[in-house]
């Protein structure tokens, strides 16, 4: 008796060649709907599923494979006499190979499918056959990925059957595949049919392997890079690398942080970042000048940094950047001449990202792993209106200081807490990240600012990601000659801080919104 294969695929890639090969190896093929039409067109002998079940396909194909003569053929254990006896009694012939891929739910979602279209792309019979076959992998070979066709054919050609170890690998892949498929459906329906003020009791997320990595944060750690099942266009995961060696774990983390900063700026802007903190941000009327400002902000720390530009890289900008060692440059595009200049540096990584999709949604989830669990929050992308800010001091900020505050407030959001930043209206001057007390961060930012020219420091302001708990911060700020501060406010000692600012003639604005970053 010939061995039987059941083939039912949405993705027809490679299926004709595969079917021809297994026919030549003596296999009988059972097929469904569209798959049968393709095989018939190529004159590959096959049997329609309804010839096996004696039951017609119906309900626009919703019901065709959910039948005991199919699932019994997949689930029956060949090593159990009771199973084989039941199969004989009910005229169930074994199926030894299942080749199934599922309705294109993800592809339809990404194409903007309507709710009705999405519902019709929820595959029922396909996952059921895959799961039945995978459960019985001791006897059944199950294939859900066209990339595995060649491996299956090789084993069948050489050995006449597949090895148990290979069937085990394929079965595990099937359950990963169906779990991912169901996770996307659950994610879609949860967003489509939300329950107000009720959190989902289960969190189902799915990610696809984008890149294996040589190591993680340190050489002794293993790491891989996975991309969200529903891709985010403006992301390091969707970037296109056009030059240089592969990204490392730390490269990906830093590039992600730099991209998050860049999307908050509309003007031509350059962001320089090291170890998850900005070391230079510059905005100007053109991208070359923006680079000058970002570089001038901290010409020491920028060495070996990550650079994001929100405009095309020009030849002049590329020539300037090529003079120092940089790990990564990310931009919407590169002029031909700029690419020629930068490509001469073998180790630099050049990437492009679609900046037209940079706007973030507050619904966009930010997932952070902790021991034994996950923390999930929405992105800190709330749109703020400076007109709603409150001047807390007697001294009013000048128009120039207000412009600098707007710039500082955008930038400090991305400094690790306790985060302090000193800026003028177009570039960062000093960054004080990640200290366990706020006055420590203030001192670091002011020290970095002190070596800048008087011209650059004119109209400089200081931004703080959270409130000042004590007035000692203001004492340090006043010593440095800073005359304007932007911070959220909200401390029980706000009045002490306000009084200190009034004492020193410093203007201070409360935004009412904190921006911790851990």
Swiss-Prot record:
EC numbers: 2.1.2.3, 3.5.4.10
Q: Give one Pfam family.
A: AICARFT_IMPCHas
Signal sequence residues: none
Q: Which GO biological-process labels does this protein carry?
A: 'de novo' IMP biosynthetic process
Q: InterPro entries given for it?
A: AICAR_Tfase_dup_dom_sf, Cytidine_deaminase-like, MGS-like_dom, MGS-like_dom_sf, PurH-like
Q: Which PROSITE patterns match?
A: MGS
Question: What metabolic or biological pathway is this protein involved in?
Answer: Purine metabolism; IMP biosynthesis via de novo pathway; 5-formamido-1-(5-phospho-D-ribosyl)imidazole-4-carboxamide from 5-amino-1-(5-phospho-D-ribosyl)imidazole-4-carboxamide (10-formyl THF route): step 1/1; Purine metabolism; IMP biosynthesis via de novo pathway; IMP from 5-formamido-1-(5-phospho-D-ribosyl)imidazole-4-carboxamide: step 1/1
What Gene3D superfamilies does UniProt report for this protein, alphabetically?
Answer: 3.40.140.20, Methylglyoxal synthase-like domain
A GO molecular function term, named singly, is: phosphoribosylaminoimidazolecarboxamide formyltransferase activity
So what does this thing catalyse?
(6R)-10-formyltetrahydrofolate + 5-amino-1-(5-phospho-beta-D-ribosyl)imidazole-4-carboxamide = 5-formamido-1-(5-phospho-D-ribosyl)imidazole-4-carboxamide + (6S)-5,6,7,8-tetrahydrofolate; IMP + H2O = 5-formamido-1-(5-phospho-D-ribosyl)imidazole-4-carboxamide
Q: Which GO terms describe its cellular component?
A: cytosol
Residue intervals of the MGS-like domain: 1-144
Keyword annotations of the record: Hydrolase, Multifunctional enzyme, Purine biosynthesis, Transferase
Q: Does the keyword Hydrolase apply?
A: yes
Which family would the database say this protein is a member of?
A: Belongs to the PurH family.
Q: NCBIfam families, alphabetically?
A: PRK00881.1, purH
- Domain remark in the UniProt entry: The IMP cyclohydrolase activity resides in the N-terminal region.
Descriptive protein name = Bifunctional purine biosynthesis protein PurH
Q: What is the lineage of its organism?
A: Bacteria, Bacillati, Bacillota, Bacilli, Lactobacillales
């Amino acid at each position: 008796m010939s061995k039987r294969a059941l083939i039912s695929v949405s993705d027809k890639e490679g299926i004709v060649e595969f079917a021809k090969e297994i026919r030549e190896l003596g296999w009988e093929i059972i097929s469904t709907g569209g798959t049968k039409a393709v095989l018939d067109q190529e004159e590959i002998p096959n049997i329609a599923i309804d010839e096996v079940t004696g039951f017609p396909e119906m309900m626009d194909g919703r019901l065709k494979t959910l039948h005991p003569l199919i699932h019994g053929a997949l689930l029956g254990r060949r090593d159990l006499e009771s199973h084989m006896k039941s199969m004989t009694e009910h005229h169930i012939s074994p199926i030894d190979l299942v080749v199934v891929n599922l309705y294109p739910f993800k592809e339809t979602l990404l194409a903007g499918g309507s709710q009705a279209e999405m519902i019709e792309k929820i595959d029922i019979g396909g996952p059921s056959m895959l799961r039945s076959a995978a459960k019985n992998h001791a006897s059944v070979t199950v294939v859900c990925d066209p990339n595995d066709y060649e491996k299956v054919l090789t084993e069948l050609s050489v050995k006449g059957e597949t090895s148990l170890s290979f069937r085990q690998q394929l079965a595990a892949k099937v359950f990963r595949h169906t779990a991912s498929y169901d996770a996307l459906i659950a994610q879609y329906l949860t967003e489509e049919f939300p329950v107000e003020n009720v959190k989902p009791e289960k969190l189902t997320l799915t990610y696809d392997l984008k890149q294996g990595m040589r190591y993680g944060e340190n050489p002794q750690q293993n790491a891989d890079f996975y991309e969200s099942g529903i891709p985010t266009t403006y992301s390091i995961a969707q970037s296109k690398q056009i030059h240089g060696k592969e990204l490392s774990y730390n490269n990906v983390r830093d590039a992600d942080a730099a991209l998050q900063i860049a999307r908050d700026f509309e003007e031509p802007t350059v962001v320089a970042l090291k170890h998850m903190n900005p070391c230079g941000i510059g905005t100007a009327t053109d991208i070359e000048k923006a680079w000058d400002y970002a570089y001038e902000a901290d010409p020491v720390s920028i060495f070996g940094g990550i650079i994001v530009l929100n405009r095309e890289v020009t030849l002049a900008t590329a020539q300037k950047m090529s003079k120092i060692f940089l790990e990564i440059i990310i931009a919407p595009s590169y002029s031909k001449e700029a690419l020629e200049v930068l490509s001469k540096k073998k180790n630099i990584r050049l990437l492009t990202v679609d900046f037209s999709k940079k706007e973030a949604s507050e619904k966009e989830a930010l997932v952070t792993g902790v021991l034994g669990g996950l923390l999930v929050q929405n992105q800190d992308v709330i749109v703020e209106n400076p007109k709603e800010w409150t001047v807390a001091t007697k001294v009013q900020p000048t128009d120039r200081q207000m412009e600098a505050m707007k710039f500082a407030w955008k930038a400090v959001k991305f400094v690790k807490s306790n985060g302090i930043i000193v800026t003028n209206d177009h570039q960062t001057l000093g960054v004080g990240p990640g200290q366990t007390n706020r006055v420590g961060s203030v001192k670091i930012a002011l020290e970095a600012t002190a070596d800048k020219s008087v011209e650059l420091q004119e109209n400089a302001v200081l931004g703080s990601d959270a409130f000042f708990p004590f007035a000692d911060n203001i004492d340090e700020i006043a010593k440095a000659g800073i005359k304007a501060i932007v911070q959220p406010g909200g401390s029980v000692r706000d009045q002490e801080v306000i009084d200190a600012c009034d004492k020193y003639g410093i203007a201070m604005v409360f935004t009412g919104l904190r921006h911790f970053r851990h």
